[in-house]
């Protein structure tokens, strides 16, 4: 009996060692070494998924000196989901949520911070779960990058290995997320080294602005070595008109239980909102974007608009961020620019004498329901400004978020990868 057990134990140990050698793994990462101790080339390029505004989970831990309502938690022992948590987006509870997720702008440092006693983190950097589903319960209403991530898995990719997510604090603009870009650079270099080939970036919405900023900071030699292509989905290259409504009278994003004016104060604190106002390098300087009985506002009138809204912090935020991508410098990598069209999209807002504390009449134009067509197609200006290819692909009838679920989008991504 004892001998048999020793033989069995030895056999199991041998099997484990063989499996370890065959798998070629060390510290959880594939070695993929070939002749000459050089990395083998993977049959497919690694992929980094980058979400847009509101496009990944946020978590919070509380130890607050006070609360806005007696039902609000003042202290928590662990981190909990702050976004997306549908249970917090209902009357009364939303007051707690707004007070936790808001930012406080410092006019001296020109930076923002969470309220006292609120610690907000971005979970799952390097993983895909926090952007596949915005709601950890995986309700369909919170489905975001799941279809694309699952398609990649079906093609042979592995979550957390050669397909990874790069979530970030989307309340802020790139100038306040320097640690994020350092972590992103290191992750891209690691993935490219492991695979023996450069990475493909797939970004959505505001995530494309983040990636353009990131690429503009990198030397061309770095981009040549580590980036194969940049797939931009629904990019607001020149800003979006919708953000004007957000800062003026609030926007409930179609959630009927939330009053736009109720959520306006919180939405204004997000620096990324002011960053994404329409830009004068693209929008006609004489086009009226906001109309009231006494005043018309164009892209040249933001200072006056913020003043009339009594929102000085907003004007400072815009000044802090407007130059980050104002020139729309080419990314210096192959770009595939996919954009939706044919969906009524907000392009101007008409207010009554109750401005700004009233819902506007919305003037519609072309786009994907969120990003105006004028903005989404600005990648065309790079066609003759960089040697790398720039491809534009219109997706008629594709809505801004639903484009991530569309078979045409998935098929296009596969064509780029393989």
Question: Residue ranges of each PLM-predicted region?
Answer:
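N-terminal non-catalytic accessory region
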Residues: 2-202, 206-267, 277, 284-286, ...
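Glycine-rich, aromatic-lined ligand/substrate-binding cores of catalytic
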Residues: 271-354
